[in-house]
Regions:
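Conserved beta-strand-loop-alpha-helix junction that forms the acyl-donor binding cleft
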Residues: 69, 93-103, 119-121
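Conserved acetyl-CoA-binding loop of GNAT-fold acetyltransferases
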Residues: 106-115
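Conserved GNAT-fold acetyl-CoA-binding loop/helix
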Residues: 1-6
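Conserved acetyl-CoA pyrophosphate-binding loop and the N-cap/start of the following alpha-helix
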Residues: 67-68, 72-80
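Conserved acyl-donor/pantetheine-binding loop and adjacent beta-alpha core of acyl/acetyltransferases
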Residues: 12, 19-69, 84, 118-126
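Conserved GNAT acetyl-CoA-binding A-motif
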Residues: 78, 85-98
Length: 134
């Protein structure tokens, strides 16, 4: 089951990696899966695919190595994800931003909703749901 889930994930959630001088500078991706973040092989997760005509694609798993922060890595990744989601027929994007990521996404045209707190292993973590029309 786990291997089948991973195989499905790679087909439906393309991730991008940027390297510089052999070092990982950043990574991120977009998805056509209903699950906004985390794996969909857990109870209560919807593993279905999104419909580009009615649903928003999901921006997922954006990380930039501290040594490469504020050097355009995240912007390059996001622009590529937007282009690929648009090419797949999606007109909107959704994401769940960490609080430090909100200014970046807002500057990139995303609009935030009210903060939500999610329990991550017994620790409540605040996120801001954000969306953007392509």
């Amino acid at each position: 089951m786990f291997l089948a889930s991973i195989a499905n994930w790679w087909r439906t959630a393309p991730n991008l990696v940027i390297e510089s001088g052999g070092e990982l500078a950043g990574c991120g991706g977009w998805s056509r899966r209903r699950t906004l973040f985390g794996g969909d092989n857990f109870a209560g997760r919807d593993s279905g695919l999104l419909d580009p005509a009615t649903d928003a694609a999901k921006i997922r798993a954006f990380f930039v190595a501290p040594a490469f922060a504020r050097r355009g890595v995240a912007r390059l990744l996001l622009e590529e994800c937007e282009a690929r989601a648009r090419a797949a027929g999606f007109a909107r994007l959704d994401l769940m931003a960490t609080l430090p990521g909100v200014p970046f996404y807002a500057a990139s045209g995303f609009v935030g909703d009210a903060a939500v707190a999610l329990d991550l292993g017994g620790i409540p973590v605040r996120f801001i749901p954000m969306s953007k029309t392509l």
